[in-house]
């Protein structure tokens, strides 16, 4: 894939993964989906998408990961066609080359952040001039995590994850060690079903109760660094059902909890990725280097990551 001569005809998007700093399952909505209360955070484990504008209307995708479909079931293709339909211009085309670094089926929104990067990138490449909130609303049609991934940072997320309340503060200093056993994936629907089977009797039943819970989440100062010192109000409900039946998650959480200077240790989303928070990136990276052999012996892939204030970065150059 070669770029056109004009810079405006190609760009690169970095699509950041997310972790769940907090995840509560509140109950079942009238549409049958679970009502959630979450705090999500972008991190600098990222996929890269190279996009080149075509002179015809072909939408073409290729990737360095052979497990990834390049057909209509891929969220990148869905996002491209959704945007094209939105502006009612079927003549638009693009070549997209995906460098996949975020693990698949890991609870890190890898597919969702790729779709978010596609929407933001093509909005610029195709000169559509849609606003961010328009893209967020549009993206709800194909995925609940995509609206968050479009703007990223740290946000409170309600509903299925698509109702966003942005959190604003100057610095996000915390670092983390993220781990995943590459041999397994966890099915999100299975995780939610397991949780419902175990804890469904305690579900809240009406919007008034949901709103009380939402206000409780809103009342917390999510910029307070001390909040993440394994305090009881920070939780991932799905961890309660996934951990006992997934030895790889149990192993990951135990190893992370044993690390020096680790703060909050948790599973992300429906798993199986898990993370430990540290005071900053440098501390996380130092601990990872000192314990890399332990992760290798446990069969875990591990990354030291920073927290990001955005979900996607765009630039008009190849590297």
From Swiss-Prot:
One matching Pfam family: GHMP_kinases_N
GO molecular function: 4-(cytidine 5'-diphospho)-2-C-methyl-D-erythritol kinase activity; ATP binding
Amino acids binding ATP: 103-113
Enzyme class: transferase
Catalysed reactions, semicolon-separated: 4-CDP-2-C-methyl-D-erythritol + ATP = 4-CDP-2-C-methyl-D-erythritol 2-phosphate + ADP + H(+)
UniProt keyword terms in alphabetical order: ATP-binding, Isoprene biosynthesis, Kinase, Nucleotide-binding, Transferase
TM segment ranges: none
Entry annotation: catalytic residues: 18, 145
GO process annotations (BP): isopentenyl diphosphate biosynthetic process, methylerythritol 4-phosphate pathway; terpenoid biosynthetic process
Pathway assigned to this chain's UniProt record: Isoprenoid biosynthesis; isopentenyl diphosphate biosynthesis via DXP pathway; isopentenyl diphosphate from 1-deoxy-D-xylulose 5-phosphate: step 3/6
UniProt EC number: 2.7.1.148
Keyword NAD: no
Annotated family: Belongs to the GHMP kinase family. IspE subfamily.
Summary of the function given for this chain in its UniProt record: Catalyzes the phosphorylation of the position 2 hydroxy group of 4-diphosphocytidyl-2C-methyl-D-erythritol.
Protein known as: 4-diphosphocytidyl-2-C-methyl-D-erythritol kinase
Species of the source: Prochlorococcus marinus (strain NATL1A)
């Amino acid at each position: 894939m070669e770029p056109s001569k004009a810079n405006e005809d190609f760009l690169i998007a970095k699509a950041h993964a997310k972790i769940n700093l907090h995840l509560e399952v509140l109950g079942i909505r009238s549409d049958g989906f679970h009502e959630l209360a979450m705090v999500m955070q972008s991190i600098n484990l990222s996929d890269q998408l190279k996009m080149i504008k075509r002179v015809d209307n072909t939408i073409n995708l290729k990737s360095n990961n052979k497990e990834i479909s390049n057909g209509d079931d891929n969220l990148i293709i869905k996002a491209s066609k959704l945007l094209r339909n939105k502006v009612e211009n079927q003549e638009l085309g693009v070549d997209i080359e995906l460098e996949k670094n975020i693990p698949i089926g890991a609870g890190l929104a890898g597919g969702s952040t790729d779709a978010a990067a596609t929407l933001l990138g093509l909005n610029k490449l195709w000169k559509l001039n849609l606003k961010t909130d328009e893209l967020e609303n549009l993206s709800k049609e194909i995925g609940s995590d995509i609206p968050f991934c479009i703007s990223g940072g740290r946000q409170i997320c309600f509903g299925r994850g698509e109702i966003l309340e942005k959190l604003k503060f100057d610095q996000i200093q915390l670092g983390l060690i993220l781990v995943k056993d590459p041999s397994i994936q966890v099915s999100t629907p299975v995780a939610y079903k397991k949780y419902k089977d175990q804890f469904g009797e305690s579900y809240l039943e009406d919007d008034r109760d949901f709103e009380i819970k939402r206000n409780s989440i809103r009342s917390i100062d999510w910029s307070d660094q001390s909040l993440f010192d394994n305090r009881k109000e920070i939780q991932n409900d799905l961890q309660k059902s996934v951990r006992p039946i997934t030895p790889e998650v149990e192993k990951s959480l135990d190893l992370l909890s044993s690390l020096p200077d680790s703060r909050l240790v948790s599973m992300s989303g429906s798993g199986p990725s898990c993370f430990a928070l540290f005071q900053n990136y440098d501390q996380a990276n130092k601990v990872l280097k000192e314990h890399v052999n332990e992760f290798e012996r446990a069969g875990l892939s591990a990354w030291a990551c920073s927290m990001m204030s955005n979900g996607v970065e765009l630039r008009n150059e190849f590297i």
